Regions:
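DNA-recognition alpha helix
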Residues: 73-85
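Short alpha-helical segments that sit at the start of domains
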Residues: 27-59
Protein backbone atom coordinates (compact mmCIF):
# COMPACT_ATOMS: atom_id res chain seq x y z
CA UNK A 1 0.00 0.00 0.00
CA UNK A 2 1.13 3.54 -0.76
CA UNK A 3 1.01 6.03 2.10
CA UNK A 4 -0.84 8.89 0.44
CA UNK A 5 -1.65 10.11 -3.03
CA UNK A 6 -2.65 13.72 -3.64
CA UNK A 7 -6.17 13.98 -5.00
CA UNK A 8 -6.79 15.10 -7.71
CA UNK A 9 -4.14 12.92 -9.31
CA UNK A 10 -4.56 14.06 -12.91
CA UNK A 11 -4.45 17.67 -14.04
CA UNK A 12 -5.20 19.28 -17.37
CA UNK A 13 -2.10 20.90 -18.82
CA UNK A 14 -3.96 23.29 -21.13
CA UNK A 15 -5.51 26.24 -19.28
CA UNK A 16 -6.88 28.27 -22.22
CA UNK A 17 -10.29 29.66 -21.19
CA UNK A 18 -13.18 29.22 -23.58
CA UNK A 19 -16.60 30.37 -22.50
CA UNK A 20 -16.05 30.51 -18.76
CA UNK A 21 -12.83 28.53 -18.33
CA UNK A 22 -13.67 25.53 -20.50
CA UNK A 23 -10.37 24.35 -21.93
CA UNK A 24 -9.49 22.59 -25.14
CA UNK A 25 -7.64 19.36 -24.35
CA UNK A 26 -3.89 19.35 -25.01
CA UNK A 27 -4.22 16.70 -27.75
CA UNK A 28 -6.38 18.97 -29.90
CA UNK A 29 -3.44 20.42 -31.83
CA UNK A 30 -4.61 24.03 -32.04
CA UNK A 31 -5.96 26.77 -29.83
CA UNK A 32 -9.11 28.60 -30.90
CA UNK A 33 -9.10 32.39 -31.07
CA UNK A 34 -11.54 33.65 -28.45
CA UNK A 35 -13.84 36.52 -29.30
CA UNK A 36 -16.27 36.58 -26.38
CA UNK A 37 -19.06 35.66 -28.79
CA UNK A 38 -20.49 32.37 -27.47
CA UNK A 39 -21.60 31.16 -30.91
CA UNK A 40 -18.15 31.77 -32.45
CA UNK A 41 -16.33 30.32 -29.44
CA UNK A 42 -18.42 27.12 -29.44
CA UNK A 43 -17.72 26.74 -33.17
CA UNK A 44 -13.97 27.14 -32.57
CA UNK A 45 -14.04 24.79 -29.57
CA UNK A 46 -15.76 22.04 -31.56
CA UNK A 47 -13.42 22.40 -34.52
CA UNK A 48 -10.36 22.40 -32.22
CA UNK A 49 -11.24 18.89 -31.01
CA UNK A 50 -12.22 17.60 -34.45
CA UNK A 51 -16.01 17.72 -34.07
CA UNK A 52 -18.11 19.11 -36.91
CA UNK A 53 -20.13 22.11 -35.69
CA UNK A 54 -23.60 20.85 -36.60
CA UNK A 55 -26.65 22.93 -35.69
CA UNK A 56 -27.48 20.61 -32.79
CA UNK A 57 -23.92 20.63 -31.39
CA UNK A 58 -23.73 24.40 -31.75
CA UNK A 59 -27.05 24.98 -30.00
CA UNK A 60 -26.33 22.49 -27.21
CA UNK A 61 -22.78 23.83 -26.85
CA UNK A 62 -24.12 27.35 -26.49
CA UNK A 63 -26.54 26.18 -23.78
CA UNK A 64 -23.80 24.19 -22.01
CA UNK A 65 -20.84 26.55 -22.10
CA UNK A 66 -22.48 29.97 -22.37
CA UNK A 67 -23.48 30.06 -18.69
CA UNK A 68 -20.16 29.34 -17.00
CA UNK A 69 -19.02 26.27 -15.08
CA UNK A 70 -21.99 24.05 -14.28
CA UNK A 71 -23.23 20.50 -13.79
CA UNK A 72 -26.09 19.17 -15.91
CA UNK A 73 -27.77 15.85 -16.54
CA UNK A 74 -28.91 14.98 -20.05
CA UNK A 75 -32.49 15.52 -18.93
CA UNK A 76 -31.68 18.99 -17.57
CA UNK A 77 -30.00 20.00 -20.85
CA UNK A 78 -32.90 18.57 -22.85
CA UNK A 79 -35.32 20.67 -20.78
CA UNK A 80 -33.21 23.80 -21.39
CA UNK A 81 -33.10 23.02 -25.11
CA UNK A 82 -36.87 22.57 -25.20
CA UNK A 83 -37.40 25.91 -23.43
CA UNK A 84 -34.98 27.57 -25.87
CA UNK A 85 -36.91 26.00 -28.78
CA UNK A 86 -33.91 23.96 -29.93
CA UNK A 87 -35.31 21.03 -31.95
CA UNK A 88 -33.37 18.05 -30.55
CA UNK A 89 -34.36 14.67 -29.20
CA UNK A 90 -33.23 13.33 -25.83
CA UNK A 91 -31.15 10.74 -27.75
CA UNK A 92 -29.34 13.56 -29.59
CA UNK A 93 -28.64 15.27 -26.26
CA UNK A 94 -27.14 12.04 -24.85
CA UNK A 95 -25.09 11.45 -28.02
CA UNK A 96 -23.79 15.02 -28.03
CA UNK A 97 -22.89 14.94 -24.33
CA UNK A 98 -21.00 11.68 -24.83
CA UNK A 99 -19.16 13.06 -27.89
CA UNK A 100 -18.18 16.22 -25.98
CA UNK A 101 -17.01 14.07 -23.06
CA UNK A 102 -14.96 11.80 -25.35
CA UNK A 103 -13.40 14.92 -26.91
CA UNK A 104 -12.41 16.22 -23.46
CA UNK A 105 -14.75 19.23 -23.42
CA UNK A 106 -16.94 17.80 -20.64
CA UNK A 107 -16.29 15.62 -17.64
CA UNK A 108 -18.73 12.87 -16.70
CA UNK A 109 -19.52 12.51 -12.98
CA UNK A 110 -21.60 9.55 -11.80
CA UNK A 111 -23.48 9.75 -8.53
CA UNK A 112 -24.21 6.30 -7.02
CA UNK A 113 -24.73 4.74 -10.43
CA UNK A 114 -28.21 6.20 -10.82
CA UNK A 115 -27.50 9.74 -11.95
CA UNK A 116 -24.85 11.04 -14.33
CA UNK A 117 -23.88 14.70 -14.48
CA UNK A 118 -21.81 16.39 -17.15
CA UNK A 119 -19.41 19.01 -15.82
CA UNK A 120 -18.23 21.91 -17.99
CA UNK A 121 -15.22 22.31 -15.68
CA UNK A 122 -12.80 19.65 -16.95
CA UNK A 123 -9.96 20.58 -14.61
CA UNK A 124 -9.01 18.08 -11.90
CA UNK A 125 -11.43 18.66 -9.01
CA UNK A 126 -13.97 16.85 -6.85
CA UNK A 127 -17.59 17.30 -5.81
CA UNK A 128 -20.10 17.54 -3.02
CA UNK A 129 -23.44 15.92 -3.87
CA UNK A 130 -26.32 17.56 -2.00
CA UNK A 131 -28.77 14.69 -1.56
CA UNK A 132 -31.74 16.83 -0.53
CA UNK A 133 -31.86 18.84 -3.75
CA UNK A 134 -29.87 16.53 -6.10
CA UNK A 135 -27.20 19.14 -6.78
CA UNK A 136 -23.52 18.68 -7.58
CA UNK A 137 -21.15 21.36 -6.23
CA UNK A 138 -17.42 21.71 -6.93
CA UNK A 139 -15.03 21.17 -4.02
CA UNK A 140 -12.56 24.03 -4.22
CA UNK A 141 -9.83 22.50 -2.01
CA UNK A 142 -6.92 21.38 -4.25
CA UNK A 143 -5.13 19.69 -1.32
CA UNK A 144 -7.41 16.72 -0.70
CA UNK A 145 -5.41 13.59 0.05
CA UNK A 146 -6.44 9.98 -0.38
CA UNK A 147 -4.81 7.93 2.39
CA UNK A 148 -3.49 4.41 1.77
CA UNK A 149 -4.01 4.16 -1.96
CA UNK A 150 -4.04 0.47 -2.94
CA UNK A 151 -1.39 -0.81 -5.32
CA UNK A 152 -2.47 -0.58 -8.93
CA UNK A 153 -2.52 -3.98 -10.68
CA UNK A 154 0.37 -4.66 -13.03
CA UNK A 155 -0.25 -3.33 -16.51
CA UNK A 156 -2.62 -0.59 -15.34
CA UNK A 157 -2.25 3.07 -14.45
CA UNK A 158 -4.54 5.53 -12.71
CA UNK A 159 -6.45 7.49 -15.34
CA UNK A 160 -8.35 9.73 -12.95
CA UNK A 161 -9.58 9.77 -9.38
CA UNK A 162 -13.12 11.03 -8.83
CA UNK A 163 -14.33 11.85 -5.37
CA UNK A 164 -17.98 12.61 -4.64
CA UNK A 165 -18.79 13.50 -1.03
CA UNK A 166 -22.50 13.03 -0.35
CA UNK A 167 -24.12 15.57 1.97
CA UNK A 168 -27.59 15.86 3.49
CA UNK A 169 -29.14 18.44 5.77
CA UNK A 170 -28.82 17.80 9.48
CA UNK A 171 -31.95 16.44 11.12
Amino acid sequence: MRDSVPVPAVETTDKTPILSDVSVPPHSGRQPALTGCPWHDVNEMLQAVGLRPTRQRMALGWLLFGKGARHLTAEMLYEEATLAKVPVSLATVYNTLNQLTDAGLLRQVSVDGTKTYFDTNVSAHHHFYLENNHELVDIEDPHLVLQKMPEVPEGYEIARIDMVVRLRKKR
